[in-house]
C-alpha cells in the first residue's frame, strides 16, 4: 500500500482493493466510478461533432469508424459527412461496444461507439477527422484538444 501511495501519489484512503477474478471490491469500484468520474460533457442538441479515433475496413459494412460524440446526436438513418475528407455516406450500422459490437438506434453527446459507413476506402475516414450530419453540418471540426485529448 505504501508503494502505491508513493509511486502514484494517491492517498491511502482512496486506494480500492479490487480483484475481478475473485469478485472482491467490484461493487465499491463501480460506486467509486459513479462518484469520482464526471459525466460526459456536450450538448446533444447542437450540430453533431464526433471525433474519429480509429477505423478499419469490413468487407460487408465498408469502412467502420470508432467515434466519440463531442456534441449532437447521431441516428442510424442519418447521412454523415467527414469534415476533413469531405466524404459522405448513408449509415449501414450504428452501435456501441459491449464488448462485442451491438447495434443501437442512436448515440448522443459523450458516448463512444462505432459507425459502419459503407465507404470503400479507409483513407476517407482518417483518425482525427470529425463526423457531422450532412444536412445540418457543424460549423467547425473538432481538434484533439477540444475532444479532451482523445487522439
Where do the model's predicted regions map?
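Conserved catalytic-core segments of large NTP-driven translation/proteostasis enzymes
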Residues: 5-151
Amino acid at each position: 500500500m505504501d508503494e502505491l501511495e508513493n509511486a502514484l501519489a494517491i492517498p491511502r484512503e482512496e486506494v480500492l482493493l479490487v480483484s475481478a477474478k475473485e469478485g472482491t471490491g467490484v461493487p465499491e469500484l463501480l460506486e467509486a466510478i459513479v462518484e469520482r468520474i464526471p459525466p460526459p460533457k456536450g450538448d446533444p442538441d447542437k450540430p453533431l461533432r464526433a471525433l474519429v479515433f480509429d477505423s478499419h475496413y469490413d468487407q460487408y459494412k465498408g469502412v467502420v469508424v470508432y467515434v466519440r460524440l463531442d456534441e449532437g446526436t447521431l441516428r442510424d438513418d442519418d447521412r454523415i459527412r467527414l469534415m476533413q475528407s469531405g466524404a459522405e455516406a448513408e449509415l449501414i450500422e450504428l452501435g456501441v461496444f459491449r464488448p462485442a459490437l451491438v447495434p443501437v438506434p442512436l448515440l448522443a453527446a459523450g458516448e463512444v461507439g462505432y459507425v459502419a459507413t459503407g465507404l470503400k476506402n479507409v483513407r476517407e475516414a482518417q483518425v482525427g477527422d470529425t463526423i457531422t450530419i450532412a444536412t445540418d453540418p457543424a460549423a467547425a471540426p473538432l481538434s484533439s484538444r477540444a475532444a479532451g485529448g482523445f487522439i
